[in-house]
Amino acid sequence: MNNIYISLYIFFISYIIQLCFNTKYIYCDKKLYVSKNILPSVEKKEFVSNVPHKLEWLVHNILEVVHFLEDVNNYIVDFKKDILTKLEHIVQDDTELYESYEYNENLLNQIYLNNEKKLKRYSEYIEKLKDTKLQMFEDTINNFQRENIYYLNFVYKNLLAKIDLITNLNKKKLDKEKKKNVIELKEYLEDLKKRMFDMQKRLNDIIITKSTFLKNESELNMKLFETSAIDYVNNNSNFEVFSTYIINDFMLNKKRINVLNYDSNLFFKNNFMYFNFLHNYLKEKKDEHVLNVYIYLKDPLIQEYELNYFNYYVVLDLYILDVIIKNVDLLIEKKGKKRKNVNHILVCIDNYVVKYNVLSSNIYLDIQQDIKSFFHESNRNVDGSKIQDMLFHFERKNNSIYQNNMFHDKYYKKKIKKDIKEEKKQNDSLQKYNKNIDPLLFIRKKNIFFDSQKEYYKKFLSSYTYEEIVNILCNKSSRCNNRIFQLINDVNKNTFILKSHLALKNELKKFFQINQNKLLKNKTGVGLINSTKDDINRITNMNLATNTNNAMGNITNDSNIINTNNNNNTSDINNNNTSDINNNNTNNINNNNTNNINNNNTNNINNNTNNTNNNSNNNNNNNIFNNEDSLNKCSAYTYPFSNDAEKNYQENRNQSFSNSDHCFKLLNSIQGANKSSDFINMQNIDDYLNTYYVAYHESFKVVKKEHYYSVISHIFESYLNIDESSNDDDHPIHKKYPHLKGRNVSINFLGQLPEIMKVYKTFRYCDSLNVLAKSYIPKSPASVQSLDKGEDNNDNDEKGESGEDTQVIEKDDSGEDRQMIEKDDSGEDRQMIEKDDSGEDRQMIEKDDSGEDRQMIEKDDSGEDRQMIEKDDSGEDRQMIEKDKSRDDNKAQNNNSTDNEEHDEITEQIGFLKNHNQKYMRLFQKHLLEEIKFINFFEFLVQKKLGVILEKNEFLKLYIFYGQKNLPSMPYTPLFFTCRTIIKIEVLRDVNTNQIIYSSRSFFLETLITLKEYKIKNESAYIVIETTDESSTIKKRLKMDMLHKISPMSHINAYVISNKGKEIVYHKGNIYQRSASDIKNVISDIRNDFLNIILPQYHLFDLFDNYVYIIICLKNENC
């Protein structure tokens, strides 16, 4: 600052000096100016007074300088203050910048830490992804190697065959030109052979170089997997957190109805067995009895199309659940149990087919070769030594299986010696057969559900379950029912069906639950294992109606499978809403409002088609609740797994087991309950063990896939939100669904059916599906005609009130239904009893050929179609004119009524869905109608013996049809393709040689396997094999004119026709073809290939359905 002041002072001094100098100059200038211009007198005066003027001027100038200096000083002071203020602002800005710098530094540190964590997670994810990709690459290389070896061998064999053909031609006397062509062809084929070998060598080199790397990576993968498994056993993994979350939401939820969706959870699907047995049976609350409803959806499509009915699903609404619970309660009531003991129901929704299982799905086991020998016909004599041999074999088999179990090392070493001793005491039965059994074998049986990756459960079901079956059937003694093993062998040579149904299931579940409780205690370190009698009694109390399956098996033969919503109270709601029960069977209503389920009054009138007699005595004799005499006679056979099984065996050994054939027939021939809506009726239901069908009902809702879970949740949430008061029993929803009242229901969506839950399709299964499909088709001929024409009108529901539908209903009551009832009374049960002894499939085929199908076809030919024609000639046009006259007047009113129609649903959204449900259902009915017409067409041809060959045995029915002029459209709906396979073969007649060219046997085999792969993936399809001409350029280039005369050059194509369109799967050359001179030879070759070579030699019985249709036609002539 001092320097600034000094500089300013110097500046001012210099300025003053300069000012003085300028002032002097001005003065002198003035002086000169005066001397020139003013007068002499004045000049004298001024000269005299020069000094005073000069002083005044100096004073004036000094004053001005002083004032200027004061101003400058003030300016400097102000300038100083301004500079100081600016300096303060600069300091404040510096402090703020420093604080922002610190804040940004902290923020950058946090971002760095977060990024570091993300990088760690990404690195872990990339490592896992690398492992999976390596595994996929390894599998791809292996599959590629197998396929290439197969095709190389195949092409090599065909090349050898062609070379042999050329050598044979060389032996003949040929022209020089022909010999030259043959030599050139031979050289070409040899060159091709060398190229193929070079390709094989290169492929082998690639595989060898990559195999070491893949082997090391797979070993590393296995080590990581084993460490994760050991971590899980030691409670060191995240799996426990995941399972805990599921249990908290799955079991401990306080809501009465809980809707969950596990559709996208692959881990849950893969570990289905583990979750099903361990979580749901071990960790549910002991003081609550939750009704677990497991729902499996079958999705037939991978890609969706908007105008396809496959997009839509039946919603599991309150009606379906109420029907299921009602049937389960009745089963429990018959067994004498309480409803709270039932807590497991499996529901499968297969698009529009709704079926459910009590407890769990059916158990079907493939017999392995080493086990099959025990059930061979030559070894039917069952004695104590054979039982011991079987059990010893099973134990040895289990030991070999568990040696590869990943849990057997560290986990089993945690067993305490006291536990092992206690297990030995509790399991003396194991020591009876082999004293050298590993004591840890008993514990190993529980870990079979952990290893879904290695699929140990398949071996487990084929060996361990047999051991349990033999222990149960033989009561752990040397005495065993000989008839049981005969039944096992008679059912099927390749499939072992558990005949004991729920009884065996309950025994297995009891074993699983008791022993897995022990596993859980050992894992959590609770202490010693104590299988007390309380545990056994608690499990025993959870047994269901263990032996009602066979009695429930053949309930009815009704073509309209309807389970009406029956109410036990007076003022039955069914009489108020008969149109809402079912349009297909308006007679299926209990007209007695005061009926109780357990009341056997003679006034219990039921118009169901299953009721063959309204007499109360016959009702009591046919009712499974009251038919105790016949059951008591077979008590030892019917209840071989109860606590008194040994006593029953001693008392009834001569009476029961010697008459086991009669008892088995009796249990399969007991009529269903004659009370209204006691059970869901289905023809030949015993093939499903405990499976029941719910046919089409008006209360069913149809929704799109993306809305399925939200609609389900909305339905049940609305039911939960109903205000419960003291008079909640009077609520209309509770009246409509009385069986849901007070139930703890947990609904769990498990996605698609797991691999373990497969159904073995029999003829009865196919017939049941056929009858179920017919229940969806309207009975009104006008409705059927509108479906044929594809009309989408909603007038069919209004026609139900007119005389037209009334006539059809009267016809059904007097004609069709009466015939079916007479058939049920006179022939069905008798045929079933004879069928069990001698010829199951044979008599059933005769029945199909002569009985049911014949009546249906005659009805279609003489009855229904005739009435439709008469109606077209006489009255339909007139009725249509009258309806057209009134349609314009009522059109707006009908449209408003459909939107604003009153409904009895719990929400407006579901009512809207119900009112607009017809268009989707009509599209589905149209598909089913095409399917039924296709089936009836072939049955009609078989009866009339017109242009079709029928081959039938115990496994399948093969229809071979030549020509396609009158063939109906070939459907590919899921319901149809669960039982039937369609193969269309288009053969070609060569113009030059007049030979008929068709596919070779190897191509036929490959095509059939490909078709089955599509069907296994739930892609409904049928296959077309066609022979096409090939352009002549290839023939000229290869100079094969001579060979063309012997074997024409053509291509064989195979197309899969499905709901996704037409997709080519094979395109082969002439090495895959053969020729014949007559179409009869073609048909004979294809029949021989399919029946005598492909099926028996390649063991493909399980690959194909029971009904196979092979349609043969000549291309460009009758295709």
Curated annotation (Swiss-Prot):
This is Uncharacterized protein PFC0810c. Residues 788-891 have a biased composition (Basic and acidic residues). Residues 1-21 form the signal peptide. Keywords: Coiled coil, Merozoite, Signal. It comes from the Eukaryota. Possible candidate for an effective malaria vaccine as determined by epitope response in sera. Residues 606-627, 782-905 are annotated as: Disordered. Residues 170-206, 890-920 form a coiled coil. It comes from Plasmodium falciparum (isolate 3D7). Transmembrane segments: none annotated.
